[in-house]
């Protein structure tokens, strides 16, 4: 029997399985790569929920690639903030320095306090009204009484109230240029004297009320 072209031969039946077995691994790898590429480029284009509207966040694809690798989205990478340089520690607090205005105010306050104390001392030594309890029998008015009354009087210096006459008189007396009369000496400053008076009443030993006018001072001044 002759071998014809139209009939399959034993040689063609032997070559066909070898050719198909050689191409099958290549086709399988190409199909797998095509699926992985489509999934990585547009993982949600095939999902009907993505076309209909917003949907909950889906988990990233975890398809395994050839060689044991796993596909990941770029959005999963977390951007870490750049490291910040350490801030220098603040210097320790030093002793508080007093500012010049505060120092000036303190000095002025000290001077003002000194002046006020001097003024108080001068006022205490100056002409002013004073009072004291005294017995009526010691007044020298001829009344017999066991009572005590408050007697007000004036005392103190009037140097600050001196006039030009008083200053010149004191200078002449100090230089010996002015001869004073025998047994007397001129006064070179005013005298602290009462300027107003009041009456005082008391009871004597006979239980009789006595009133003395212009007995006690109520105001003082430098006179002369």
UniProtKB/Swiss-Prot annotation:
InterPro entries: Cystine-knot_cytokine, GDNF_fam, TGF-b_C
Keywords: Disulfide bond, Glycoprotein, Growth factor, Secreted, Signal
Signal peptide: 1-39
Low complexity: compositionally biased ranges: 96-116
Single GO term (MF): receptor tyrosine kinase binding
Biased composition (Pro residues): 80-95
Annotated protein name in UniProt: Artemin
Organismal lineage: Eukaryota, Metazoa, Chordata, Craniata, Vertebrata
């Amino acid at each position: 029997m002759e071998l014809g072209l139209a009939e399959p031969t034993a040689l063609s039946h032997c070559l066909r399985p070898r050719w198909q077995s050689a191409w099958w691994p290549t086709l399988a790898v190409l199909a797998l790569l095509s699926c992985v590429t489509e999934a990585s480029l547009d993982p949600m284009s095939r999902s009907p929920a993505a076309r209909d509207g917003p949907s909950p966040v889906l988990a990233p694809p975890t398809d395994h690639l050839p060689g044991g690798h796993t596909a990941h989205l770029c959005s999963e990478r977390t951007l870490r903030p750049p490291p910040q340089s350490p801030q220098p520690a603040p210097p320790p607090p030093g002793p508080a320095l007093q500012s010049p205005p505060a120092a000036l105010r303190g000095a002025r306050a000290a001077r003002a306090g000194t002046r006020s104390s001097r003024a108080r001392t001068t006022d205490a030594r100056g002409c002013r009204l004073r009072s004291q309890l005294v017995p009526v029998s010691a007044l020298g008015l001829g009344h017999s009484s066991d009572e005590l009354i408050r007697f007000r009087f004036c005392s103190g210096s009037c140097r600050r109230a001196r006039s030009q006459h008083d200053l010149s008189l004191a200078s002449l007396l100090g230089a010996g240029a002015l001869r004073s009369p025998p047994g007397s000496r001129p006064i070179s400053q005013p005298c602290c004297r009462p300027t107003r008076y009041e009456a005082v009443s008391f009871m004597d030993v006979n239980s009789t009320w006595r009133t003395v006018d212009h007995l006690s001072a109520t105001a003082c001044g430098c006179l002369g």
